């Protein structure tokens, strides 16, 4: 009989000593922010040089297994410092919040795209702030959980408090602002233009820039698509050109939040009415990490093979 591990081939588990959490912890440590998490030694060594500008660029979805086949000898791979894992669940909501908060998902509570809240009696899309299934607005709810139980102190706030410098975020125009110094940018060109403009300012600063691609293209077209390949190659070329122009007192750290893998076969719960009969309410969280609310009299009927 096979073990559980043998039944789960090619599963990449998070390593919380070599993960994106440790990457952002190194940046917090550089700015003397108090944190209980371990930093990334390889990045700590690079940051021993005191930089005027620290720039973190997050390319959503551009994991190791996406980048390497597309550009095995490009600018990103040539300057690779270390391979790190994402957090769990390895999804934008959980991973991006790890960068924003400097804490893992099990501390922030930001664990998935769609999370159930008793305050609303329904599942909510965490980044869009809407009801998950009917996409209803939550504006008339008695409590805004994003201002109460789901609120957290951002790395921008922490860095400005401890280091007494300005911390900027560069984000897509649809995103919620997490810094009091937020700049909207929807393309790689706009991201680069804003980084170059900020770096020209002689003050010390931290800049975090986020691109929602290649993730959006990977979801829509797949990991082997021309669309995703073209974006990554173009972004790599333009970021390389930018880095070559930036002054020596500026460091650019480039990372992903998670990777991607094509699915071979998909299943819909809607095709299994007997299974739906067991649920109190629809599943939530992520397709890669689902939660189920099971009717008490149906628990013995279900067997998930665990």
Model-derived regions, located:
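Feature captures the catalytic ectodomains and active-site-proximal regions of enzymes
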Residues: 1-306
């Amino acid at each position: 009989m096979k073990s559980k591990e043998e039944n789960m081939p090619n599963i990449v588990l998070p390593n919380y000593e070599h993960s994106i959490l440790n990457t952002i912890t190194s940046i917090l440590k550089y700015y003397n922010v108090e944190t209980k998490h371990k930093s990334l030694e390889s990045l700590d060594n690079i940051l021993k040089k005191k930089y005027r500008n620290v720039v973190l660029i997050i390319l959503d979805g551009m994991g190791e297994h996406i980048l390497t086949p597309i550009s095995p000898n490009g600018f990103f791979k040539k300057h690779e410092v270390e391979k790190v894992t994402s957090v769990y669940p390895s999804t934008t909501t959980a991973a991006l919040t790890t960068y924003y908060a400097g804490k893992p998902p099990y501390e922030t509570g930001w664990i998935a795209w769609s999370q159930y809240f008793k305050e609303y009696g329904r599942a909510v899309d965490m980044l869009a702030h809407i009801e998950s299934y009917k996409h209803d607005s939550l504006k008339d709810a008695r409590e805004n959980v994003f201002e109460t139980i789901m609120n957290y102190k951002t790395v921008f706030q922490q860095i400005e408090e401890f280091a007494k410098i300005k911390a900027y975020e560069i984000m897509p125009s649809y995103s919620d602002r997490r810094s009091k110094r937020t700049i909207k940018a929807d393309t790689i060109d706009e991201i680069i233009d804003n980084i170059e403009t900020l770096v020209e300012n002689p003050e010390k600063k931290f800049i975090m820039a986020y691109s929602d691609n290649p993730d959006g293209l990977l979801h829509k077209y797949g990991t082997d698509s021309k669309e995703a390949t073209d974006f990554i190659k173009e972004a790599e070329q333009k970021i390389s050109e930018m880095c070559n122009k930036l002054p020596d007192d500026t460091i650019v750290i480039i990372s992903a939040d998670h990777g991607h893998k094509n699915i071979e076969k998909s299943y819909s719960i809607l095709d299994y009415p007997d299974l739906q009969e067991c649920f109190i309410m629809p599943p939530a969280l992520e397709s890669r990490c689902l939660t189920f609310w099971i009717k008490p009299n149906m628990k013995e009927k279900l067997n998930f093979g665990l």
